[in-house]
């Protein structure tokens, strides 16, 4: 009965052309779907640091509150705090766990959470778990956010949460304007800087990009699995926030901590981003890609991030399959992740790509769209 039920549901997914399956990235010559924006996952120094961390064991053996707290964890948290210019930080097992754990711990029943309509699924899930009241404001629409805040300012606790860089379009939230608004309404701002850390603000992230100083009511969440090139998540803010999360954030309390090797590699990655300004090469590639992609008509507006939505509608799946035949990995993004008619190939570039890579991609898409 159970097997048959699953088969029926899977067939329904296939019938709607929404079926997903795993692919091995080693099968491709050119990867345009990676989040490894700075190429740090394959950096020799990062790998050496990872191997050094193995001396403390292959696994962490427990949660941070039991047997899984190492000096390396606390060292990484210090490195992140300095990097993000905050008082303290806390490392989570993933970016998803960080968003879910922070939001569900801070927002309670009777509180109000205002969320951008295009926020990541982990933010949406965190709000659901919190049982707080939720209102959605139009995408990056500051005026709409003000209107909603004005109508609901009687709430004692208000949290505004937004992605910094939106993962499907690569556009950037107007954090500078939102930061001013939350002060006026005595609200808290949670920023998911997953795609901004290592990319914007000379690598420091979105606050630095907008020249907004970290403050008591701004919380920065990030991931180690994108530009940093390892795995895990983190949150940065005031000391009392971190102490509160250690005692109240369920995804932190009840998760096995990250292995020492991952922590060691992450420390090295942050050092490299800080000292070598790795985002410089990425910025050059973004300028190059902007020109080529726009000339070929794949984008209308230039980007300041490495994410490009090539919107082809329903043709996106077939074009993606065609790219695979040419050794190019470009993931098709379909409904319900994006609206119907807005299906796209999400192209992400890295500091390791070269101009000829962009040219090759454009040439093959041109042929596939004739």
UniProtKB/Swiss-Prot annotation:
Chain positions recorded as pyridoxal 5'-phosphate binding sites: 95-96, 167, 192-195, 223-226
Catalytic activity, as annotated: 6-carboxyhexanoyl-[ACP] + L-alanine + H(+) = (8S)-8-amino-7-oxononanoate + holo-[ACP] + CO2
Keyword Transferase on entry: yes
A Pfam family annotated for this UniProt entry: Aminotran_1_2
EC number: 2.3.1.47
Cofactor(s), by name: pyridoxal 5'-phosphate
A GO MF label: pyridoxal phosphate binding
Keyword Transit peptide on entry: no
UniProt pathway annotation: Cofactor biosynthesis; biotin biosynthesis
Gene3D superfamilies in the cross-refs: Aspartate Aminotransferase, domain 1 (3.90.1150.10), Type I PLP-dependent aspartate aminotransferase-like (Major domain) (3.40.640.10)
Superkingdom of this protein's organism: Archaea
Residues the record lists as binding substrate: 20, 120, 337
InterPro entries named among the record's database cross-references: Aminotrans_II_pyridoxalP_BS, Aminotransferase_I/II_large, AON_synthase_class-II, AONS_Archaea/Proteobacteria, PyrdxlP-dep_Trfase, PyrdxlP-dep_Trfase_major, PyrdxlP-dep_Trfase_small
PROSITE patterns, per the entry: AA_TRANSFER_CLASS_2 (PS00599)
Modified residues (N6-(pyridoxal phosphate)lysine): 226
Keyword terms of this UniProt record: Biotin biosynthesis, Pyridoxal phosphate, Transferase
GO annotation (BP), single: biotin biosynthetic process
Assembly mode: Homodimer.
Similarity comment text for this entry: Belongs to the class-II pyridoxal-phosphate-dependent aminotransferase family. BioF subfamily.
Function description: Catalyzes the decarboxylative condensation of pimeloyl-[acyl-carrier protein] and L-alanine to produce 8-amino-7-oxononanoate (AON), [acyl-carrier protein], and carbon dioxide.
Name of the featured protein: Putative 8-amino-7-oxononanoate synthase
UniProt organism field: Methanococcus vannielii (strain ATCC 35089 / DSM 1224 / JCM 13029 / OCM 148 / SB)
């Amino acid at each position: 009965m159970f097997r048959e039920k699953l088969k029926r549901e899977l067939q329904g997914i296939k019938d709607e052309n929404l079926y997903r399956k795993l692919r091995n990235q080693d099968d491709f010559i050119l990867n345009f779907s990676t989040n490894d924006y700075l190429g740090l996952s394959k950096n020799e120094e990062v790998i050496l640091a990872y191997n050094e961390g193995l001396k403390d064991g292959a696994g962490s053996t427990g949660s941070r509150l039991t047997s899984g707290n190492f000096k390396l964890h606390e060292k990484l948290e210090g490195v992140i705090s300095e990097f993000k210019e905050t008082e303290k930080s806390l490392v989570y097992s993933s970016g998803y766990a960080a968003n879910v754990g922070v939001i569900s711990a801070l927002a309670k029943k009777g509180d109000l959470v205002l969320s951008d309509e295009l926020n990541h699924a982990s933010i949406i899930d965190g709000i659901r778990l919190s049982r707080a009241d939720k209102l959605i404001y139009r995408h990056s629409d500051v005026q709409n956010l003000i209107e909603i805040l004005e109508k609901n300012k009687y709430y004692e606790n208000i949290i505004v949460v937004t992605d910094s860089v939106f993962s499907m379009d690569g556009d950037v939230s107007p954090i500078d304007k939102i930061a001013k608004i939350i002060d006026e309404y005595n609200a808290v701002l949670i920023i998911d800087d997953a795609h901004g850390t290592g990319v914007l603000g000379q690598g420091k992230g979105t606050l630095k990009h907008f020249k907004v100083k970290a403050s008591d009511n701004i919380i920065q969440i990030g991931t180690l699995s994108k530009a940093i090139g390892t795995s895990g998540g983190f949150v940065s803010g005031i000391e009392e926030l971190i102490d509160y999360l250690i005692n109240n954030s369920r995804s932190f309390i009840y998760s096995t901590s990250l292995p020492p090797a991952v922590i060691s590699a992450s420390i090295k990655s942050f050092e490299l981003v800080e000292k070598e300004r790795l985002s410089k090469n990425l910025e050059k590639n973004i300028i190059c890609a902007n020109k080529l992609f726009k000339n070929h008509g794949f984008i209308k507006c230039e980007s300041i991030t490495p994410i490009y939505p090539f919107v082809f509608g329903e043709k996106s799946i077939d074009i993606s399959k065609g790219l695979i035949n040419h050794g190019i990995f470009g993931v098709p993004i379909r409904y319900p992740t994006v609206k119907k008619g807005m299906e796209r190939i999400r192209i992400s570039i890295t500091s390791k790509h070269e101009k000829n890579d962009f040219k090759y991609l454009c040439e093959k898409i041109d042929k596939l769209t004739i």
